[in-house]
Amino acid sequence: QIAHSLTMIGGSRPDNNTTVNASLVTDDHKAGIYLFGQGRHRASYDHDGDGYSELGKLEAKTLGFRSYLKTSNYSKLTFEYHNISEFRRGGNLLDLPPHETDITEQTDHQINGGGLKFDLFSRNYHHRLNVYTSAQHTKRQSYYGAGKDPNAYGNTTDMTFIGGVQYSYEWDKCLFMPATFTGGAEYSYDDLQDEMLGYHRTIAQTVHIGSAFAQNEWKNDRWSFLIGGRLDKHNMMDHVIFSPRANVRFNPTKDINLRMSYSSGFRAPQAFDEDLHITAVGGDVAIIQISPDLKEENSQSVSASVDFYHRFGPVQVNFLVEGFYTDLRNVFILEEIGRDEDNNLLMERRNGKGARVMGINLEGKMAYSWMQIQAGATLQRSRYKEAEQWSENPNITPQKKMFRSPDVYGYFTSTFTPVKRFSASLTGTYTGSMLVQHLAGYIPEDREEKTRDFFDLNLKLAYDFPIFKSVTLQVNAGVQNIFDSYQDDFDKGAHRDAGYIYGPGIPRSYFVGCKISY
């Protein structure tokens, strides 16, 4: 299959995307390979004409394969490899070297990764053994700078490795009903080296995590009970984390599914990808550092749902109502702590007192012979347990509401095939109003902004032309963000807050494409 699409962002800036994939299988189906590749070129986009991009330019190439080999009737070897080359740049004067511009954020990634997996089954398929390993190496060259800074270049290397084993057993009867036991162990390694000498920042972080897990699920047509847990030992923590989970399902009728679940998890006190990012603010930059007293973030979650399935003649419907509640302890927050000797803004990742996230999720699906519709809406409340002070501006009071967390959001997807070779897709997302942090620079002082809500509606029309018996050409076209529901208050100029971006990713854009399938 070969496909290409051209999207005109804002009706003026091109985004070209080409994909190629192919599947090959031997006649006896004992071996197969899936090849894939992608090339993408996106021009930068300046929405307000100030010479600074709201969408950076992008050059990306991906090449890889996934393959399998059946070593016997009850065993299979699977291996995968991928290479990703990605260049991104935003700011102004994009044709000049970064250190000759007012603002540039630029990254150049080279990623190589792969994995190997072996599956072994018993003759009756009651026993299954899975052994797996994967590794990935990332090399990144970056520039995050403002004011023609010649020292804002950086280098990052990251090496990750995961290896593990998983065993499962199917019980015909365990105590009171059929069950499946799953257990295993896993080891993960991550070595991160990040240097930005111009900002006096060096991160040398090596992470080792050893894990063991087990669960048992009893299940029949009417009931299911799951209980399990996971043990994790992180080398940056002096204790073992136990994360239990449980789930109960009950079907009073074949059309109704009742479910309750509990789960827990944690986030380790380590540097993550978002902590490596440096944002231009007020003609300088904002640098994130990790508090030496940072503790792990813990979560406890419960949910309950009712799932209804029914067929009304030729129409199939599904409706879901779900309530959820998550309690976060030692929640990670980001606070201003002053400026360094070069007047760069310092942001510290530290622990807050905690937070609670709760809400209701509603989803519905309907399928007819030539039409499928799915829609969902979430009503959510995300609050810190105690108001958190994020800015040094004394005019900003501490805030309990989580930033960039709307109380209402939703989506819908629909596909129509009124005639055999023609299809139409109409999709949309709704994002409610939310609070966003806006840092001083273009504006005189830090402030909290309450955004408007957004409705992003997209339309795609496609028609398939049969060329030969096994060859089909599809031609498609459409519009993204039909109502041009897009942010209209970007900062301008060299003193902008580059992180003050919210809402849909692109303005109203038009696209055409074609696809050849063999």
Regions found by a protein language model. Give the residues of each.
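Membrane-embedded beta-barrel scaffold of Gram-negative outer-membrane proteins
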Residues: 29, 35, 128-144, 259, ...
